[in-house]
């Protein structure tokens, strides 16, 4: 059995619920290439591994408080061994490879995780979550054209999943200059695509603040933004969030947008109403920018 002695949890922002959950539910319907009885047993074993895995994660979070994680690591190693046995017994059971690959990714074993997901993709190339994870790996390795291809395939398979649009938007933004230098995009074209992807994610999940926030922030990332549209987005976010701290953060972005529009008096007026201590530094920076461009 392959053993992974260093368990490093990688809790990513904005992840789809763990594949183990969804694919555990689908396991009974997956084509394992085995006989019906062995297929049922494989589905049962996968479901059991999924449940043990979820339980171990919850216990791990509690164990971190008491610094008593050894027993949880032992359980995780047992689950790894269980996955190894399952994929050995059912080598064409795509749900097992996906669940195992996602687990390895979650505990920080990137390379073995990628290998499992590549195998899953070879067995069945129509799982968007696999394309997304393969794209993540390529992006982390700096292989941005390959990452873009995987993200686009994920979108093609699941066009209504906001995460995939968000992932592609982030990739295009992070590697913007590289895409332009490689002549894969023109400057205006990549700016348009970045905004389109973030806008699509926000539209598909309007109740999810991170997607809406990133779309609104994207107006500051492009060369020729529509500031009127940006101002409308920030006003909507002021009304959307509930906590006073979040409202003031959105108002500070509104002030920055007003400044970019040339409305320095309106920007200063908004800033005067912001008294959240955590925003003091950002507020001072913006005020200095305003005063430098519009000295009294």
Report the location of each language-model feature.
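N-terminal leader/linker segments that initiate helical-solenoid repeat arrays
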Residues: 22-84, 88-89
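Structural signature of tandem alpha-helical TPR/SEL1-like repeats
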Residues: 72-81, 106-119, 140-153, 176-200, ...
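Canonical positions in the second alpha-helix
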Residues: 86, 119-120, 153-154, 200-201, ...
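Structural marker of alpha-solenoid helical repeat scaffolds
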Residues: 89, 123, 157, 204, ...
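Residue-level recognition of tetratricopeptide repeat
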Residues: 93, 102, 127, 136, 161, 170, 177, 208, ...
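TPR alpha-solenoid repeat register
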Residues: 96, 130, 164, 211, ...
